């Protein structure tokens, strides 16, 4: 059958590939999460401390007696499963090897969970590399809602793959998969896959995130900044406050992840586009000439996809110089910035396409990479 509208294709594709559609005889359901996080970045020591409140809705027909969290930073050390996998591969990932084997104790990544409760009751948990298994104080019945509260400390790894500090272009912090993250549960059960440098799958929900760090830093992130008048840095008309630190407050709805990047040397361009979408470009001054046309290209890319796959469903899109190549996250992408202009155009167009596939689609990238790549 010939479909004239790409929007119809996207709709049908989503219906045919959602977990609910594959679960014969079961009604459609998805788990839902609502994160509230308050974190402080200790820039000089490359560490972070934070608190997380997670409202978890069990919309499945199953009673849950355990939950699982991903602790992605634990992958970045010479003894992790990701390191071991690459140690024995005939064709190891050149972005990981040999760097991961040379990480010193102050360069590795880790998460330490200092407390975890369910509706106020302390919980026991075990950590296996990048996965934390939690025994619940009481089961979560179908339709049940619980609140998990957590305190954690983390060391931000030297950038090896996607996330970390001090990437090869001198960006201080590329913060992807940076928080203890609830694994997804669907009709196939828990997807608590160990992290070996591959892809992601998570439940949709909301994020309310406060990040405190030195006032010289400029942040690009998922979501909308809630306090631009307190921040400046191009988000508001105010000058950068003369304080030691600033707390940035972001909110995002109907997303399955939250990422951010921070550097004291970012330039920040803001472009207002069609359909009330705001575009943010963050890059360092030494690549400004290469980024000159990005203020034209980025809105054109999103508008192109919007005409073909359905309107871009979020209020903003951020392109930020960070990471180790190109990687998509809700409402933003991290890309290397010191490449030729046509390279910037190509990688941005590719990553922007992920705002629909897998961003809106929400497919399991780990199992079904063909759906979005």
Regions found by a protein language model. Name each.
Residues 46-59:
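Short beta-strand elements of extracellular/lumenal beta-sandwich folds
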Residues 52-54, 69-71, 144-158, 207-215, ...:
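Short, hydrophobic/aromatic-enriched beta-strand segments in well-ordered soluble domains
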Residues 22-49, 169, 176:
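N-terminal, polar/Ser/Thr-rich
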Residues 57, 94-170:
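A surface-exposed beta-strand-loop module
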Residues 81-93, 153-207:
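Glycine/proline-rich low-complexity spacer/linker segments in large multi-domain proteins
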């Amino acid at each position: 059958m010939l479909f004239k509208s790409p929007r119809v294709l996207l709709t049908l594709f989503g219906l045919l590939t959602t977990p609910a559609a594959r679960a014969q005889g079961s009604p459609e359901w998805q788990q839902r999460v609502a994160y509230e996080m308050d974190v402080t970045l200790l820039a000089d020591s490359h560490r972070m401390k934070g608190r997380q409140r997670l409202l978890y809705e069990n919309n499945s027909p199953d009673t849950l007696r355990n939950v699982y969290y991903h602790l992605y930073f634990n992958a970045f050390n010479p003894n992790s499963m990701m390191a071991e996998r690459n140690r024995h591969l005939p064709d190891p990932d050149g972005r990981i090897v040999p760097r991961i084997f040379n990480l010193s104790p102050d360069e590795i990544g880790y998460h330490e969970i200092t407390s975890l409760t369910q509706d106020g009751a302390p919980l026991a948990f075990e950590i296996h590399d990048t996965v934390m298994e939690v025994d619940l104080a009481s089961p979560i019945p179908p339709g049940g809602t619980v609140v998990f509260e957590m305190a954690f400390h983390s060391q931000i790894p030297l950038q090896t793959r996607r996330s970390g500090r001090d990437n090869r272009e001198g960006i201080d912090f590329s913060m992807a998969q940076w928080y203890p993250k609830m694994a997804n549960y669907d009709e196939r059960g828990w997807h608590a896959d160990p992290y070996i440098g591959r892809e992601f799958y998570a439940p949709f929900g909301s994020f309310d995130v406060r990040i405190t760090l030195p006032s010289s830093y400029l942040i690009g992130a998922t979501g909308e900044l809630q306090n631009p008048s307190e921040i400046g840095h191009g988000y508001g008309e105010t000058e950068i406050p003369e304080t030691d630190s600033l707390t940035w407050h972001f909110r995002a709805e109907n997303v399955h992840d939250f990422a951010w990047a921070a550097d004291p040397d970012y330039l920040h361009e803001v472009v207002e586009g069609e359909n009330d979408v705001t575009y943010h470009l963050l890059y360092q001054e030494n690549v400004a000439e290469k980024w000159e046309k990005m203020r034209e290209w980025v809105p054109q890319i999103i508008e192109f996809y919007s005409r073909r796959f359905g309107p871009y469903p979020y209020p903003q899109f951020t392109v930020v110089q960070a990471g180790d190549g190109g990687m998509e996250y809700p409402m933003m992408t991290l890309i290397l910035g010191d490449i030729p202009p046509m390279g910037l155009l190509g990688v941005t167009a590719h990553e922007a396409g992920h705002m629909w596939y897998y961003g809106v689609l929400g497919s399991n990238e780990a199992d079904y990479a063909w759906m979005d790549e």
